[in-house]
Amino acid sequence: MAEVKPHHYDVIRRPLITEKSTLVAEQNKIIFEVAPDADKKAIKEAVEVLFKVSVTKVNTLTQKGKTKRFRGFEGRRSDVKKAIVTLAEGQSVDISTGL
């Protein structure tokens, strides 16, 4: 495996721990919030290096930010890019320990 580099920590922002993410964890999948400019190759490399696991597939999606109003002013929340990472059979990651 490759060595850990500082840009790996820039690619993966945080794991998303929701009801849905705990359900897909049973299927050997982990959901991360990633940098908006990160591509699938960079996400795969970062997960493999940081967590020392092998990744079989990476799916990404961009959740558009909502428009919100506050005291007559209209603003917009930031977009969020998520990655659903599928691990190889028999591999797991304990995301509660952190990076």
UniProtKB/Swiss-Prot annotation:
Q: What is the protein named?
A: Large ribosomal subunit protein uL23
Annotated function: One of the early assembly proteins it binds 23S rRNA. One of the proteins that surrounds the polypeptide exit tunnel on the outside of the ribosome. Forms the main docking site for trigger factor binding to the ribosome.
Give the protein family: Belongs to the universal ribosomal protein uL23 family.
Q: Per its UniProt record, what NCBIfam families does this chain match?
A: PRK05738.1-3 (NF004359), PRK05738.1-5 (NF004360), PRK05738.2-4 (NF004363)
GO biological process entries: translation
A molecular function annotated in GO for this UniProt entry is: structural constituent of ribosome
From the record, give the transmembrane residue ranges. Answer: none
Q: InterPro entries recorded for this chain?
A: Nucleotide-bd_a/b_plait_sf, Ribosomal_uL23-like, Ribosomal_uL23/eL15/eS24_sf
Self-association and partners: Part of the 50S ribosomal subunit. Contacts protein L29, and trigger factor when it is bound to the ribosome.
| Phylogenetic classification of the source organism | Bacteria, Pseudomonadati, Pseudomonadota, Alphaproteobacteria, Hyphomonadales
- Keywords annotated in UniProt: Ribonucleoprotein, Ribosomal protein, RNA-binding, rRNA-binding
GO cellular component annotations of the record = ribonucleoprotein complex; ribosome
Q: Which residues form a coiled coil?
A: none
